[in-house]
């Protein structure tokens, strides 16, 4: 079988996107090796390490020349989504190189969506337009897990295979594959780290993005399940952005309502950065855990304003999503239904370690 390598590091066998097992979830762990002292300093000065999660491209099965993959994301703004798009674009380049496609025969992709994931109607309108153009495959990150039913049915009726990435939809029977972070694990990780920091006791709040988004539901579910193991911790508030008119005002009100708040978990990058921007009392010692290691959160960790970050590998997610979409267009190729990437904990002890660079935005 002819294969073209796209990563210099050892490829984890679990990443392979061939071989469908309906209902089974494949979890992919990177397990970065810790480097300390002189070794870490030396590697930090070198070029960013390549992502070990990127699979090889199997060229033994034909892809139709000129295939176009349409991507409709729930958001197109922010460092996380920039990384997702970069991974997708690099996957397209790697496929064209591996198959030796000329410019005229090249596989292409489009990346569209709203600039705010709360703009669900904008995403639906974009989906309608994209499906009408009859792409070879559709990749979707759903801003509202219940909102895309009609569009998914239309795609199915027109023979357009669908890969959902990042945030799933309610009716998964209409989806060929799902590629995402293990968001329940992300929530569990946040709960575990927060409980450890508080010695298993104290009042906490959860400040969250949209409740109607599947990835957020999974993070909250994992967090609640894990935090319940700490009898001394009380969850005083869970506030969803789509449940209030002004999220910033709602967070301020929660802090005033609970002056004894000991900890906070923010479920995505936007909410994390919004919380960091709030004016707090000088003597505030609330332990904060955020999501997705953006520039602002990295600085907050270094400054001691944030304990740490549960972060994802958006580049790998984007890369694998495109390869999966193209696999769904191949005849006779079975594709794993569900494949989840492990999140990683980022704090002051590993932020400068190149082994974790794919989780730093």
Please report, for each region that a protein language model flagged, where it lies by residue:
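Hinge/beta->alpha junction and helix N-cap segments in small-molecule ligand-binding domains
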Residues: 73-85, 106-122, 144, 179-189, ...
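Hydrophobic alpha-helical segments within soluble ligand-binding/sensing domains
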Residues: 48-64, 123, 178-204, 247-248, ...
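Exported/periplasmic ABC-transporter solute-binding proteins
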Residues: 262-263, 269-272, 276-315, 321-342, ...
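Short, low-complexity disordered leader/linker segments with a strong preference
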Residues: 1-68, 131, 153-160
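Hinge/cleft segment of the Venus flytrap/periplasmic-binding protein
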Residues: 34-65, 215, 226-230, 316-361
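Signal peptide-proximal N-terminal region
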Residues: 89-109, 229-231
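Flexible loop/hinge segments that line or gate small-molecule binding clefts
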Residues: 145-185, 203, 294-302, 306-307, ...
